[in-house]
């Protein structure tokens, strides 16, 4: 791997051989290549400062290129890496401007559990995602990604996902989450969605399931039994009231009322998380009573500002 990376650093930029005296732009590219080589070498050698730990136990290693402008485009020119990176758990490419040429880099990390690449220049889902069957956390917000039938099918196979963030992309088509039983957070704000996610109710969704569909002009809402768990999932969904049809808004408010949520409430009740903050601490007494009090307060009409 060292030999190929060293050769890459000295390789042409934009098909132009390196001159004896580099321009400012060429110098910046060389610096980014060197930074990438240093990071990849360290993680390959399992440098301790890159380890991901939980409760004192080493879970894997992390690659963090966050907020390095221009690095995403340079990563797209990286040659194949002749090394094993199965020990890498997390990759953070937020703010690097990754492009559709990132597949070559990502193909080296099939076993990662977390991939973040917001503020990107992607126009499609990376094909390498199809091999990342261990992914639990995927965030690709703020790009120009559009979904296709093939990319939806590939995304559907990421059955271990717990969080999927695709907000601020012109997706057009809705993602299929029918095979994602562990999904807890789905962010689809401002994604040019007309319909709800495919397979929303093909799996039981927990009380804490969070779905963000704000800034989408929804033209329909699923038909479910008022007061049911499915009605609660719909009622807790965040959407923009002024962007949906009157019929959708009327049914949405009815579902909220059926599960005891103030129909004028903008954000869903905090539920378990709010109760946990209210009742935590070594000096807390009458925990059950406090939980019940919190629930009554959240369900009261007009309680959201409080």
PLM features: what roles do these ranges have?
Residues 154, 176-297:
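Leucine-rich repeat domain C-terminal region
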Residues 66-69, 95-96, 119-120, 143-145, ...:
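Conserved "Asn-ladder"/turn position within leucine-rich repeats
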Residues 1-60, 258-306:
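Terminal targeting and flexible regions in eukaryotic proteins, enriched
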Residues 20-120:
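LRR N-terminal entry segment and analogous cap-like coil->beta motifs
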Residues 61-63, 89-93, 112-117, 135-140, ...:
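Conserved hydrophobic beta-strand positions in leucine-rich repeat
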Residues 49, 72-81, 99-106, 125-129, ...:
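The feature encodes a structural signal of leucine-rich repeats
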Residues 83-86, 107-110, 120, 130-133, ...:
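Inter-repeat linker/turn residues at the boundaries of leucine-rich repeats
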Residues 141-157, 163, 171:
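Tandem repeat protein-protein interaction scaffolds
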């Amino acid at each position: 791997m060292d030999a190929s990376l060293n050769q890459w650093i000295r390789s042409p930029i934009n098909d132009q051989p390196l001159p004896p005296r580099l321009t400012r732009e060429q110098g910046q590219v060389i610096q980014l290549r060197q930074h990438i080589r240093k990071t990849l070498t360290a993680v390959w050698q399992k440098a301790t400062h890159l380890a991901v730990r939980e409760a004192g136990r080493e879970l894997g290693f992390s690659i963090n290129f966050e907020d390095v402008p221009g690095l995403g485009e340079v990563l797209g020119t990286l040659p194949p890496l002749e090394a094993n990176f199965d020990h890498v758990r997390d990759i953070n490419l937020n703010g690097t401007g990754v492009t559709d040429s990132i597949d070559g880099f990502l193909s080296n990390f099939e076993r990662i559990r977390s991939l973040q690449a917001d503020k990107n220049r992607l126009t499609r889902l990376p094909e390498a995602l199809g091999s990342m069957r261990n992914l639990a956390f995927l965030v690709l917000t703020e790009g120009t990604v559009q979904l296709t039938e093939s990319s939806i099918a590939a995304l559907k196979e990421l059955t271990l996902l717990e969080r999927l963030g695709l907000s601020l992309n012109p997706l057009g088509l809705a993602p299929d989450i029918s095979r994602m039983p562990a999904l807890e957070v789905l962010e689809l704000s401002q994604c040019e969605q007309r319909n709800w996610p495919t397979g929303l109710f093909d799996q039981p969704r927990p009380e804490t399931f969070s779905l963000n569909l704000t800034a989408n002009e929804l033209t329909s809402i699923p038909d479910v039994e008022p007061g049911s768990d499915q009605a609660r999932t719909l009622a807790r969904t965040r959407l923009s009231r002024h962007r949906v049809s009157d019929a959708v808004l009327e049914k949405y408010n009815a579902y909220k009322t059926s599960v005891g949520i103030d129909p004028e409430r903008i954000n869903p009740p905090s539920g378990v998380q709010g109760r946990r903050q209210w009742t935590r601490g070594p000096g807390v007494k009458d925990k059950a009573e406090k939980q019940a009090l919190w629930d009554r307060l959240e369900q009261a009409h007009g309680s959201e500002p409080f």
